[in-house]
Amino acid sequence: EDCRRQRQMCIRDRYYDIYAKYMAESWKYGAVDLPSDFTSNYKKSNVYAYRFDWDEQNVYLGVDLPNLLGAAHGMELAFIFKSDGLLGESSDAINDIMYNENNRSTDLELSTKMGQYWVNFAYDGNPNSAPYDMSTEWKPWNKLNNNERFIVFDSVNDKGIAMFNNTLSANSILQGISSESITVDQKCNIIDKMFNRTTLTDEEVDEIYRTFMSGKCTRA
């Protein structure tokens, strides 16, 4: 109904949202949670993890880009380095699609703060102070006692900048997929895509297929 009222082209298939959710979760688990646990424990050094959540693109030709693209991979670089498109100093097809002029001030506020964290870290390995004092402390990853582990970067129009602790495990992801109200074939397709490229051994992947939904999925 909202799509028709706003004359937007919407992704109506709920499977798209479910598929995107678990692809993102598997990426976070394998590329952030696991290595952060290992590095912070083994090396006894501070690890700073983040999630970029900005999704305030324009609706372009009726396409809901905030839903279709969201905070896509690498998009935070424009904010860290304050790109010309973000500043409104470069107008081309991509920038006009990506950045909503009505959100310019909040985009720039987020960009400035992100850049300051990065400068601080480059200065002395601590993103929180010198030369810039930051109002939200970016705490190092700590897997003990359910501590806050990573910072989320978003504009004040949404979550803003804040620390979070929702970490993932392989079991939590697989259980989530299993509990979704989609077909078995769709669940198996998600599993196939998740393990299409993996650092797990063939034996480990085979064991996952054997145990997931009582072996209803066949490895592609």
Role assignments for model-derived ranges:
Residues R14-A20, I97-E101:
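Flexible glycine/proline-enriched surface loops and loop-helix/loop-strand junctions
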Residues Q8, A20-Y22, D55:
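Alpha/beta-hydrolase
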Residues R12-I18, T183, T201:
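Alpha-helix capping and helix-coil boundary motifs
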Residues E1-I11:
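Single conserved hydrophobic/aromatic residue that forms the stacking wall/gate
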Residues Y19-A31:
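Helical cap/lid subdomain of alpha/beta-hydrolase-fold lipid enzymes
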Residues G30-A220:
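Mobile gating loops/cap/lid regions near enzyme active sites that modulate substrate access
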Residues C10-D13, K28:
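Low-complexity, intrinsically disordered or weakly predicted helical/coil tracts enriched
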